[in-house]
């Protein structure tokens, strides 16, 4: 038992050395947010990353909590072309849940476990400048990222804080916009030229049939979308990953957030547990 523990530490050592001082952007969502054990393990993983000299930045989602709050308030969601319409009232609820509830819970839990976390949203210091997303028709205050101003993030991480970001952006029209958390995380990672972007999902990674694909180049990932291997909700995640890698991010990891300590298992072991997308070296 003791030698197993030593071997785990020895396996992690070269990765701890390699990533010391590097920035990781982690999208927290899916199973990791819903399962108490996974949620607790996520907090522990972030604290450990911080203590090993890595600079973690968290971007979180919260779709199910928004739906639950709307239900509690007796507001029926409206859908157009399969997408939720975010009118002004819905946007207020989105902001209340993401910024006022989920963000503060994550910050509190990190701080209780020895971190120095600060909660912000994309509106703060114009971190995320957004514009209306129109590819699905007019669905209200759903936005896409127009620009990221990362100065506030540099200030926080240089002063040893862990930024926790709710993906609510500010439009040049002064309106708040709800932004997909994967997209927000990818754009933030690109703006920082982060070493890694880690997307926590509800599945083990990119699958071919029931077999996990451990590594992909951006070109290979796009081929899997074209040939129908990658389908449904995994398509936008893979597209985000490809965009991030081509935008200067060292590597993107798509992993199952429902697996306890998924981040540590992916980052600090040779085999990993998910799919890594990166350019070929050399």
From Swiss-Prot:
One of its GO terms (biological process) is L-arginine biosynthetic process. Keywords: Amino-acid biosynthesis, Arginine biosynthesis, ATP-binding, Cytoplasm, Kinase, Nucleotide-binding, Transferase. Substrate binds at residues 62-63, 84, 178. InterPro entries: AceGlu_kinase-like_sf (IPR036393), AcgluKinase_fam (IPR004662), ArgB (IPR037528), Asp/Glu/Uridylate_kinase (IPR001048), Glu/AcGlu_kinase (IPR001057), NAGK-C (IPR041727). The record marks 27, 237 as: Transition state stabilizer. One of its GO terms (molecular function) is acetylglutamate kinase activity. The keyword RNA-binding does not apply. One of its GO terms (cellular component) is cytoplasm. It is an enzyme of class 2 (transferase). Its EC number is 2.7.2.8. Its main location: cytoplasm. Pathway: Amino-acid biosynthesis; L-arginine biosynthesis; N(2)-acetyl-L-ornithine from L-glutamate: step 2/4. It catalyses: N-acetyl-L-glutamate + ATP = N-acetyl-L-glutamyl 5-phosphate + ADP. It is found in: Cytoplasm. Pfam families: AA_kinase. SUPFAM superfamilies: Carbamate kinase-like. PANTHER family: N-ACETYLGLUTAMATE SYNTHASE, N-ACETYLGLUTAMATE SYNTHASE, MITOCHONDRIAL. Catalyzes the ATP-dependent phosphorylation of N-acetyl-L-glutamate. Belongs to the acetylglutamate kinase family. ArgB subfamily. This is Acetylglutamate kinase. The gene is argB.
